[in-house]
Amino acid sequence: MADSCIFCKIAQKQIPSTIVYEDDEIFAFKDINPIAPIHILVIPKQHIASLNEITEENEAFIGKVLYKVSLIGKKECPEGYRVVNNIGEDAGQTVKHIHFHILGGKKLAWDKL
């Protein structure tokens, strides 16, 4: 755990959240500032700053995280959902702990970036 990482603290239940899913390695919770009717964050409990820090040693683990993203997405958003992962400040990553946004609950537009 990174001492100052808010997502590590949420996964360790030092900061309260609305839990959607949890196992020994993965934690999913509702975003406190949702941008869609359903907005869930899925994180590994292990601190990994971003996809750019994935190594051969943890590539299979990230596959497991993405599998859980798909299971949670199908359950929570049966009509469809979007998965977003921001990498780096220019992309909008504000928390340096890898996380996947599941967005759904309405028809989502695809606008210009």
Swiss-Prot record:
Q: Which GO terms describe its molecular function?
A: adenosine 5'-monophosphoramidase activity; hydrolase activity; nucleotide binding
Entry keyword annotation includes Metal-binding = no
On the tree of life, the source organism's domain of life is Eukaryota
Which stretches make up the HIT domain?
A: 6-113
Indicate where this protein resides in the cell: Nucleus; Cytoplasm
- EC class, as a word, reads hydrolase
Where does this protein hold AMP? D31, N86, G92, T94, H99, H101
Query: Family per UniProt?
Result: Belongs to the HINT family.
**What is the native source organism of this protein?**
Entamoeba histolytica (strain ATCC 30459 / HM-1:IMSS / ABRM)
Q: What is this protein called?
A: Histidine triad nucleotide-binding protein
Pfam families in the record: HIT
What does it do? Answer: Hydrolyzes purine nucleotide phosphoramidates with a single phosphate group, including adenosine 5'monophosphoramidate (AMP-NH2), adenosine 5'monophosphomorpholidate (AMP-morpholidate) and guanosine 5'monophosphomorpholidate (GMP-morpholidate). Hydrolyzes lysyl-AMP (AMP-N-epsilon-(N-alpha-acetyl lysine methyl ester)) generated by lysine tRNA ligase, as well as Met-AMP, His-AMP and Asp-AMP, lysyl-GMP (GMP-N-epsilon-(N-alpha-acetyl lysine methyl ester)) and AMP-N-alanine methyl ester. May also function as scaffolding protein that mediates protein-protein interactions.
Which Gene Ontology CC terms are recorded? cytoplasm; nucleus
Keywords noted in UniProt? Cytoplasm, Hydrolase, Nucleotide-binding, Nucleus
Q: Which PROSITE patterns match?
A: HIT_1 (PS00892), HIT_2 (PS51084)
